[in-house]
């Protein structure tokens, strides 16, 4: 290839500097958005040396022209963002569906280990389907979840999603029994384990690392915010540093790692939320979930809203939230997988915002707006 030839000899200092930078960065630029960014930065440098007749520089300019042609085609077929179904295709040949579980865990932020009362926004009823009841075993919940989905796709495979509360909070042997009970159910091909950043001991990581040699294991951390002042306000009981440490330790074991953040938490400005995208992008995350802040009946945050509504910005206008998400996505690392952008709570529990949209309807509106704005994931990403 042209850049292999360029590297063999350099005949002037200017070309030496530009060529070395070009070669080093080109070898690392494995994503179209990164390549495009490289083209712009290199061209800005090279244009000052266009009168140079070094053969190496001529080849660099030729490669840049070729890249420009490639980018012209790439712009027409550019993916708006990396979605979760496409991510799963890296691991599974057919359709895979997550089944949410309530395995009877609690939370160190509820039982006094870290704090009492839990996070101010939290009501686990909002994300547990009807079949998730703690009096049912993990296996029974999975079988009922399978029946719910199997009528549409008889060949479907499933991921056991340990979702409710903190699913790594317990004795190691008890945790192992729960996970292995799930994996013993027919057609369950992996685990997704939701937890807190401060609840991942090394002994459990050792076990999950070994388990992942034979099955799919994704660890999903509730990060919620990158600002410690916000984490204190919502009574999370952990810091941003704890989240960074947990993600890095997990990724170092070769495990896929997911993160979850909430947009619109009290006290956070639009600039705060957009700045968060850069912090999230620096983490070795594979997947990310976003969702809007929802006020849920019976939570401490709902009471706070009654007392100080001026502290909250609830995105009552869905188009305002879409505008934020578009700007956020553009600032994210180009290879990060985006699993979702909204959350849906039962109508009887939801105070606000109530958009009346299904997830797929929101995604359609988001994609439409991104196309109108010529926006895509990573467009404004700055390493």
What are the roles of these predicted feature ranges?
Residues 12-15, 52-54:
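Cysteine-centered motifs
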Residues 51, 60-61, 69-71:
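Short, positively charged and aromatic/hydrophobic N-terminal segments
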Residues 70, 74-159:
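N-terminal [4Fe-4S]-dependent radical SAM core
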Residues 74-88, 92-97, 295-383:
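Auxiliary Fe-S-binding modules of radical SAM enzymes
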Residues 97-101, 158-160, 191-193, 217-221, ...:
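Hydrophobic faces of well-ordered beta-strands that scaffold small-molecule active sites
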Residues 125-145, 149-172, 187-200, 216-242, ...:
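Core AdoMet radical
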Residues 241-301, 319-342:
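Conserved C-terminal portion of the radical SAM core fold
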């Amino acid at each position: 290839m042209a850049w292999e030839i360029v590297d063999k000899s350099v005949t002037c200092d200017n070309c030496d500097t530009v060529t070395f930078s070009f070669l080093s960065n080109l070898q690392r630029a494995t994503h179209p958005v990164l390549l495009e960014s490289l083209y712009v930065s290199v061209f800005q440098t090279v244009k000052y040396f266009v009168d140079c007749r070094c053969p190496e520089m001529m080849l660099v300019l030729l490669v840049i022209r070729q890249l420009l042609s490639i980018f012209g085609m790439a712009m027409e077929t550019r993916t708006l963002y990396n979605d979760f179904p496409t991510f799963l295709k890296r691991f599974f040949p057919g359709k895979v569906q997550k089944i949410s579980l309530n395995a009877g865990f609690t939370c160190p932020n509820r039982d006094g280990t870290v704090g009492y009362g839990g996070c101010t926004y939290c009501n686990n009823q909002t994300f547990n389907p009807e079949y998730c009841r703690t009096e049912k075993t993990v296996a029974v919940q999975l079988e009922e979840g399978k029946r719910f989905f199997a009528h549409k796709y008889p060949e479907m495979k499933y991921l056991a999603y340990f979702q409710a509360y903190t699913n790594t909070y317990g004795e190691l042997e008890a945790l192992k029994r729960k996970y292995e009970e799930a994996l013993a159910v027919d057609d369950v091909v992996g685990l997704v384990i939701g937890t807190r950043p401060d609840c991942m001991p090394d002994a459990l990581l050792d076990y999950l690392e070994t388990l992942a040699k034979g099955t799919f294991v994704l660890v999903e951390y509730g990060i919620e915010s990158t600002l410690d002042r916000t984490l204190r306000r919502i009574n999370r009981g952990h810091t941003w540093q704890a989240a960074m440490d947990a993600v890095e330790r997990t990724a170092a074991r070769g495990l896929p790692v997911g993160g979850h953040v909430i947009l619109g938490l009290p006290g956070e400005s639009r600039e705060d939320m957009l700045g968060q995208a850069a912090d999230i992008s620096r983490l070795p995350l594979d997947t990310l979930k976003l969702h809007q802040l929802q006020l849920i009946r019976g939570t401490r945050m709902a009471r706070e809203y009654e007392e100080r509504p001026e502290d909250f910005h609830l995105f009552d206008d869905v188009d305002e939230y879409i505008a934020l998400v578009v700007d956020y996505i553009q600032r994210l690392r180009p290879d990060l997988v985006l699993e979702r952008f909204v959350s849906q709570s039962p109508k009887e529990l939801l105070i606000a915002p109530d958009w009346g949209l299904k997830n797929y309807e929101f995604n359609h509106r988001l994609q439409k707006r991104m196309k109108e704005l010529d926006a895509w994931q990573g467009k404004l990403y700055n390493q």
